[in-house]
Amino acid sequence: MTISDKIRVYELSRDLKLENKDILDAAQKLSISVKSHSSSMSLEDAKKIKNLIRNGNSGKKIISVSKSSFKAANEQQNNIDNQNKDSNSRSKPLNKEKPSKESLNKKPLLNKPVNKEENSLISSNKKNTAKLKNPNPPSRISNLQSQVLPNSHNKTQHTIKTKNPNEKKNSTKIVQEKKSLNNNSPLRTKSPARPPIQLIEKPKNLTTSNKDIKANKKNDNSLNQRPQQANRLNNNNNFPKKNINNPRIKNTPELVGAPIRREDPKINSNRQNSNSRQPPSNIQASPNRPVIPNRQVTPNRPSNPNRQGVSNRPGGGQNRQGVPNRPGSPYRPGNPNRQGMSNRPGVGGQNRQGAPNRQGSPYRQGDPNRQGGNYRQGDLNRSGSKFNNQNPSGIRKPVAPNELMQLQKTNASDKEKLNRSNFEKQKVEPPKQKAKAPNSRLNASPTAKKTPHRSFTNNSKKPGRSDWDDSAKLEALRNKNPQKQRQKVHIIGENDDSLTSETSGYSGEKVSILSASLARPKKEKSEEPKSQKTTRQFKKKNKETTRQRQKRRAMELRAAKDAKQVRPEMIIVPEDNLTVQELADKLSLESSEIIKSLFFKGITATVTQSLDLATIETVAEEFGVPVLQDDVEEAAKKTVDMIETDDIESLIKRPPVITVMGHVDHGKTSLLDSIRESRVASGEAGGITQHIGAYQVEFEHESKKKKLTFLDTPGHEAFTAMRARGTKVTDVAVLVVAADDGCRPQTLEAISHARAAKVPIVVAINKIDKEGASPDRVKQELSEKDLIAEDWGGDVVMVPVSAIKKQNIDKLLEMILLVSEVEDLQANPERLAKGTVIEAHLDKAKGPVATLLVQNGTLKAGDVLAAGSVLGKIRAMVDEHGNRIKEAGPSCPVEALGFSEVPTAGDEFEVYPDEKTARGIVGERATDARATKLAQQMASRRVSLSSLSTQANDGELKELNLILKADVQGSVEAILGSLEQLPKNEVQVRVLLSAPGEITETDIDLAAASGSVIIGFNTSLASGAKRAADSNNVDIREYEVIYKLLEDIQSAMEGLLEPDLVEESLGQAEVRATFAVGKGAIAGCYIQSGKLQRNCSLRVLRSDKVIFEGNLDSLKRSKDDVKEVNTGFECGVGCDKFSTWNEGDIIEAFKFVTKKRTLNK
């Protein structure tokens, strides 16, 4: 159907009763852009095509059924003719027409003017034609000419109209040749019998081929697309004579099945530029069509005598012999008798490189269907190929089957139409399968064998088979595994010697012409190999063999081992625990070394097990690496960080917060005491600092009183807690180093703390009054840690002091003030308070108590604040003097009461305007804090639990299971902290549940199942809990004082210990006489001290040496058995296992008693 003013190609072909290819070729001649049978064109373009075809046909029919049947009859006769012609052609010499080197190396355009040599060949062909007497010559050459020359004849009728200059130059010669050929051949010869070995009888064949060509005009797209081949046919008309005389021609490899490439736009453009196209009139297949000008044809090609159906293949055909005008192409006699070539315009002809008459090429054998053993099986008698668009004679295209079929792959509708038209024309040959290359030819020689790699063509069946009329079978054959068929054909095409050197030449250009009207197959062809190649590469890239994997692993292990040979100077432990693998990485050791070290210390561990800080320090010291606790590498939330944009207008200077750090033996505490005592003499009380860990002093500097806030960090407890929370409250760090000891591991730790807080460091070199003090040595050691003194050109202030003699204390304070002034410390006292919790504890009378350091704003009594996950409302505040105050400004330490729980040291606190807002924030923080704490507790217990399991296997482990319930979370944490301080060498305390609140029935059930004791601290029992405890025999202990609770728990732990057996002396006796009784003996003794008891243990001493130790089995006094004998009495002593008594032996009587063990032992 037409679309507005347009018409489809297949509609036009149906109207004109032509093939789609004919219409597409005509459109290409007229430069009308159409791509496939479904492309549309304007009605004007359609009229042009109609006029072109009608003018070319000159009123003749395109195809008739009678010609198809006539063609089939000719094909049967040609089989016999081919065999005879082959035998004649073998006896003819082939070397007469060997092209010159110059002409072989020179590869002209396909439409090349006929040279002299070709003219001579044409004239010789004419002579041969004149000799023919029989109108039906059996020769293959005549058959080839009959299928090619009429087309050429028809085209020469229009050479006067052509725009190609080459055609005009050669038109005279071609017209003459046409006349000679037509005069020698009748118009239509239907004679079924032909003389057997008449090789040069062209006239009959010419006439027949003219009719055949007219019948196959629909299929003659290749002729129109490749006018160059017609020129070759024309120029090669004189070749048959020499070919017949050349015996090698028969076996010359003919490039009949050359693999055709997909159409390349560059090749196509070159083809259009280089090929001198025929005018539109050349499209029509006239029965009297002469050889196309400039198309050199080898009419007498003895190497392919039996190839029928060549008339429709202008590029191939009878005249494909030596190809004299193909420069550089030797004789390739391996494909001599390939039939069905003339209908392939892009391959046949004398100018085709790698053509059958390549001189010097050996015979290619091994293809069964090549006559004489030298013919390519897949190319000999391929007939009726729908791609070749030939008449029913069974002519086969000369290109490689896989290439051409993929190029000419059409959709289903095209295939049906082409198959239908071919079937109507031939009646005997079914349409060819789309993806299968023709495997056998109908007219193959009797001795030809079928190549197993070739797929069957439509003529592989006998003509007239009724089963080929079934369209379903045809469709099934067309769609049957085309990829495999293409692969098979492609392999044969690659092995074809006639294609290897010339596949990139004119054959490629001809392919582009053949596929000009079929864009879809080209797409499939180009995409399939690419996708396969990509997939193959992807799989190959991602696949790693076992050998490669082992090699890569070995290289990685070697590199890791090389990297671990350098030991670090120190290691930093994050959050006080590391796994074995992490510790090995930090120490640059193998994990097996760490496990071995732990094993020798009695600890069984795996690479994923966590180690506590003490264990890490022990292992690291063994390898000579000091251990430092990790600093949280995040910005310190100092006062300036707590200042908001609204505070800028109200900022004032605030006192600095100074933290004193250093090794415990370097006088840190003494220096703090010295500063406090000097201020006490001035009337400033500082006793409160013993409780809150922070205090504030005044110092006169430049006639002004300056306040300094000192943060006491004994044992690094408060400071470590703050670092763990990522909070830094220090403005200036004072590093105390002993002049007689130098830098110690804790000194390095203090430096690390200060650097993590990003605060300035002031070094106090203490103990300068002692003998052996060397401040310069301390400066040298500190310079190695990048702390360079000012007098050495650095920026670190170092002050030599003596805490005992109070030397340079004022100078130290002055330097601290100078450094703090450089820091420009400011705060806004008019806003709500923000700060940090320095210390927190649970007081018996006051409840949870926290020491707060206000960093910004003013803290007032009654404020609602949130400290971490703890909510509080300030009920009272106490300053460093112990006085109650109502408010505290920036940098002021206070002791605050009123928290719901004991807050965590190091948490930040912030005052909120109302309690509701504070509660919402506290609830979110509490959830996160509990999850974090649980993870830390589980991590810290891994090693101890592992070692405990080993002890339990040995029967040495005792456990006390507890369930702890308290009034508030602060009490729970305080009790848990105290329990951690108890000795755990032999008895472990396992707290299965710890939570604030009352004791419930659920707690009773858990205790009954686990055998635990319930500890209640300042809490009560829920209803029903007491009854459940009595029924389950669960022990509940309630306490109000933490000390009593800890004493009872310690006593319970000691009760789990095995008691000690202690030897207790009873008395001593001396042996004064012996009496033999039966087999034994009795010793008469005198009790010197103490007493003897029956069944007690005794020890016999002789000359101060123990000769026997056992039990006292018999004790008598005057023949009476008694239980004991006291001092001053005589008695008889008998032992079952000892009878060698001597006078003077000493008997020591004793017994073993149990003694309760304590946890301290």
From Swiss-Prot:
Primary role:
One of the essential components for the initiation of protein synthesis. Protects formylmethionyl-tRNA from spontaneous hydrolysis and promotes its binding to the 30S ribosomal subunits. Also involved in the hydrolysis of GTP during the formation of the 70S ribosomal complex.
Organism taxonomic ancestry: Bacteria, Bacillati, Cyanobacteriota, Cyanophyceae, Synechococcales
| Family of this protein | Belongs to the TRAFAC class translation factor GTPase superfamily. Classic translation factor GTPase family. IF-2 subfamily.
Instruction: Give me the stretches of Basic and acidic residues compositional bias.
Output: 83-105, 164-180, 211-220, 412-432, 464-478, 543-561
Q: Where is this region: G2?
A: 687-691
Q: Where is this region: G5?
A: 802-804
Region G4: start and end of each range?
Answer: 766-769
Give residues annotated as binding GTP: 662-669, 712-716, 766-769
| Provenance organism | Prochlorococcus marinus (strain MIT 9515)
Signal peptide (from-to): none
Q: Which UniProt keywords apply?
A: Cytoplasm, GTP-binding, Initiation factor, Nucleotide-binding, Protein biosynthesis
Key word Protein biosynthesis present: yes
From the UniProt entry, list the residue stretches annotated as the region Disordered: 67-561
Task: Cite the HAMAP family for this sequence.
Answer: IF_2_B (MF_00100_B)
A cellular component annotation (GO) from this entry: cytosol
Q: What is this protein called?
A: Translation initiation factor IF-2
- Grouped into one coarse class, the protein's main location is cytoplasm
